Amino acid sequence: MSVVAVTIFVAAYVLIASDRVNKTMVALTGAAAVVVLPVITSHDIFYSHDTGIDWDVIFLLVGMMIIVGVLRQTGVFEYTAIWAAKRARGSPLRIMILLVLVSALASALLDNVTTVLLIAPVTLLVCDRLNINTTSFLMAEVFASNIGGAATLVGDPPNIIVASRAGLTFNDFMLHLTPLVVIVLIALIAVLPRLFGSITVEADRIADVMALDEGEAIRDRGLLVKCGAVLVLVFAAFVAHPVLHIQPSLVALLGAGMLIVVSGLTRSEYLSSVEWDTLLFFAGLFIMVGALVKTGVVNDLARAATQLTGGNIVATAFLILGVSAPISGIIDNIPYVATMTPLVAELVAVMGGQPSTDTPWWALALGADFGGNLTAIGASANVVMLGIARRAGAPISFWEFTRKGAVVTAVSIALAAIYLWLRYFVLLH
């Protein structure tokens, strides 16, 4: 059955990577195939932690999507972008830096796709007022979103998958990855002038930007206060997980439920933000990966990787980091991480007696998150941004994105390698 499981998975992966077929349909078709043949049973799918659907991931995404959907109704994201542009006093470079920081922070608290969807429209507005090219700003923002998303458990879907499989908490991500993300963001800001060159703007255009009223962006102040209160409670519960022992997925669902009750929005308004295609895609993917786990394919790969690295935790971590970045750049990092987590879990189990056994998990998360910047299809946020740019009449080619993204990815992965080496293999010994 292992040959059947591998054949179905590889075929589905190729179709997903081609971006020519609906990826949700492919994932669900592949899932149906491994069930019908049958490689995996319904009990494995719904109840097994190792081979089934990861319900923690699904419900965390549902909860956060609803929370973000309600928050979107307030106009707070548009307010923040306009505020940043005015504080920069019309300077293109300063505007870019502030929007990069806003994008990174928003991605850490929400997710990078949502951040791009919310920040990009205002970026287009500001660039139109300044009469400057939007492509540089949009690319800088999506780079920052993918980097910032690495900082927290909820910032990027790959992190959610890693956390669920490895048993890592919101605090673990804050403690281990946020310091590196800050360093990488500083490096990104430092290379922005070299990446995009000098951008000039006329004085009267600056006056137009300064005339924008960010206060008008807020559409519902009462709802904004309610959202703020619920978000404080949600993130407090994330941070208090070691004490409360409440799963992040349950916290997100409770927060979403509270906002549904207090917001007064209709069902269509708060459910419209739930990306059902994404959730079904995850479910299908988990089932196909579960088939690989059940048939022993993942176990065999883990043992082969252990032999390649001699079972050394340092070599294993750097192998995962080095492989994850380019692969995540070629294909979407979500299916890649869903495939790799059982493999890394097996590797960690084999090397359980060594110190710093969480390091391969951090290497996987960083490689996937930062590698998403490599090409235009490396992360879902990139695809969304390209669509926005195309509709705005400023299309970005695959290779234009890749030339810039390759530089950002190389710098990010180099800093990640140094960080992992120093923090987990030098300073701890």
Curated annotation (Swiss-Prot):
Record localization: Cell membrane
Membrane topology summary: Multi-pass membrane protein
Gene Ontology molecular function terms on file: arsenite transmembrane transporter activity
Cellular component GO terms, alphabetical: plasma membrane
Keywords: Cell membrane, Membrane, Transmembrane, Transmembrane helix, Transport
Pfam families (UniProt xref): CitMHS (PF03600)
Transmembrane segments: 26-46, 51-71, 99-119, 135-155, 173-193, 223-243, 278-298, 311-331, 361-381, 407-427
Full protein name: Uncharacterized transporter Mb2703
Record-linked PANTHER family: P PROTEIN
Family the UniProt entry places it in: Belongs to the CitM (TC 2.A.11) transporter family.
CDD domains to which the protein is assigned, alphabetical: P_permease
Main location: membrane
Superkingdom of origin organism: Bacteria
